[in-house]
Amino acid sequence: MAEKDATASGDDAIRVSGMQFAYEVEDPIFFDFNLDLPAGSRCLLVGANGSGKTTLLKILAGKHMVGGKNVVQVLSRSAFHDTQLVCSGDLSYLGGSWSKTVGSAGEVPLQGDFSAEHMIFGVEGTDPVRREKLIDLLDINLQWRMHKVSDGQKRRVQICMGLLHPFKVLLLDEVTVDLDVVARMDLLEFFKEECDQRGATIVYATHIFDGLETWATHLAYIQDGELNRLSKMTDIEELKTSPNLLSVVESWLRSEIKLVKKKKKPVAPWKPSPFDNSPFRSSRHMAYYR
């Protein structure tokens, strides 16, 4: 059961009520999941790998249908059914890298000999002043050729394009992982201004906690598909005695790992089979997957 503060109200920017979700032929990821975030908040979404953070963000972004129209609401509208949320730019999602799935090779980076200018100026209906501000903020060279630049430079262009339209709710999934420290801190300051000046709401999933103690207003901790904790940053008792947020989250995750190990059933020892040396049981060379 999550520890919640008293911020839930009719003015919530995000409201999830009794959500259940599972991928096809798999066990449920979320069961009776609830989340309420007020407008203007900056919420850190933390948890171990595989806890459900990315899936939750995609559900909030309207990429997965769950339950009825009132189960997942963003700005008092159905995240999945109200497509105008995304089309208008009110709801924006930034996550993952520019990649495509190619056969059994998995995901590979998108390739294309086009400039950053071509991509950024190709987004229609944008404010030129906001566009120039983002280009300057992210230190983007409009002459960059996108098939030649680094992952961090590609990420800057991706972020710029995703922020060109003023958002009301922004969902971020590890978008700063490729950025250097200066670009990351400048971007976080921009997000803070968007919340303070325009009342925007941000949910930010990350494993990099430097400088976030004073940036975030709320923290949501997901443990194995459950909302273990939801509280204001000022109400987290551990932060008052710990040197930083990293130490606090680390202690939570280590406790979680110990609990999982206690519940884990012992694995039966491997026994050789007479068929192991059979030519019909050979495996592909690992180079196939490189």
From Swiss-Prot:
Pfam family for this entry, one: ABC_tran
Compartments in which it is found: Cytoplasm
Organism the protein comes from: Arabidopsis thaliana (Mouse-ear cress)
Induction / repression: By sucrose.
Binding-site list for ATP: 47-54
Ranges of residues in domain ABC transporter: 14-249
GO molecular function, one term: ATP binding
Name of the protein: ABC transporter I family member 19
SMART domains tied to this protein: AAA (SM00382)
Key word Cytoplasm present: yes
